[in-house]
């Protein structure tokens, strides 16, 4: 369709932007990414999480996820490389005050040195019993879980898992269950200085991709469509192993235009 074709002026406008773009930023290979990701996660768990738990007045936080139905925050809490929860994966964070936040996993499969394994294995019923024991031994004031009617990212505990948890804890402990909404949102929105540095590099990669997308390497005036440019951006990210959050959208618009 005619209105999807780039006019020559679009190329002229974007050439100056492309020429001012910085040199290409190197993208780490899949093999080398986990070391960086896990160093950042270790810092977050050791320094950021204790502060956020105290600011939100939560002394115990549970994140429980099932394979193929992850909690939205699950992958932000576990070491890489990892694609999903395994079977039923239970993470327990308990604030011990000056001793720091204890990080436990009550799960069939270990999570490396970041988490202390608190279960030696067994069937699913034994796993829930062990979780209840871990919680009772620590006697928290609040048992925060990911349940929220406002923030989807903080609403990761399914109804069936909630029922399993409440049943395993019994009436006394289950009465302490509360929403971890504030903590979950703070965890997801807060970046450490080291992460900010990485994000800045990510922005540079996005900018250099956009610069190339709007250059003569990609656009032929009167031929290239906005859809072509959008798919170039998408393909470029995919080729670098950088999964986009959403499909790129490219459109033309300016004051006085009749489209």
Task: Give residue ranges: language-model regions.
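Positively charged n-region of N-terminal signal peptides that target proteins for export
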Residues: 1-4
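Bacterial N-terminal signal peptides
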Residues: 7-17
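Polar low-complexity intrinsically disordered regions enriched in Ser/Thr and small residues
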Residues: 13, 230-231, 259
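A composition/biophysics-driven feature that prefers long, compositionally simple stretches
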Residues: 19-215, 223-238, 242
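Acidic, glycine-rich loop-and-beta core segments that form the ion-binding/anion-interacting portion
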Residues: 234-259
């Amino acid at each position: 369709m005619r209105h999807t074709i780039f006019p020559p002026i679009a190329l002229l406008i974007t050439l100056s932007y492309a020429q001012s773009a910085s040199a290409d930023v190197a993208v780490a290979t899949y093999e080398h990414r986990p070391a960086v990701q896990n160093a950042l996660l270790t810092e977050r768990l050791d320094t950021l999480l204790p502060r956020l738990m105290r600011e939100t007045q939560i002394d115990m936080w549970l994140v429980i996820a099932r394979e193929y139905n992850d909690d939205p925050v699950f992958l932000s809490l576990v070491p890489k490389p990892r694609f999903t929860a395994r079977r039923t994966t239970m993470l327990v964070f308990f604030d011990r005050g000056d001793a720091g936040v204890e990080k436990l996993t009550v799960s069939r499969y270990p999570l490396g040195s970041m988490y202390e394994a608190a279960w030696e294995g067994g069937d699913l019923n034994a796993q829930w019993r062990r979780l209840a024991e871990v919680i009772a031994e620590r006697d928290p004031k609040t048992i925060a879980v990911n349940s929220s009617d406002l923030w989807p990212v903080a609403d990761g505990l399914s109804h069936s898992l909630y029922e399993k948890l409440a049943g395993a804890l019994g009436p006394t402990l289950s009465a302490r269950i509360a929403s971890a909404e504030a903590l979950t949102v703070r965890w997801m929105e807060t970046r450490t200085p080291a992460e900010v540095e990485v994000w800045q590099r990510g922005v540079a990669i996005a900018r250099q991709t956009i610069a190339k997308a709007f250059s003569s390497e990609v656009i032929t005036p009167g031929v290239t469509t906005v859809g072509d440019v959008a798919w170039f951006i998408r393909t470029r990210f995919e080729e670098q192993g950088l999964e986009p959050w959403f499909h790129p959208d490219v459109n033309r618009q300016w004051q006085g235009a009749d489209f």
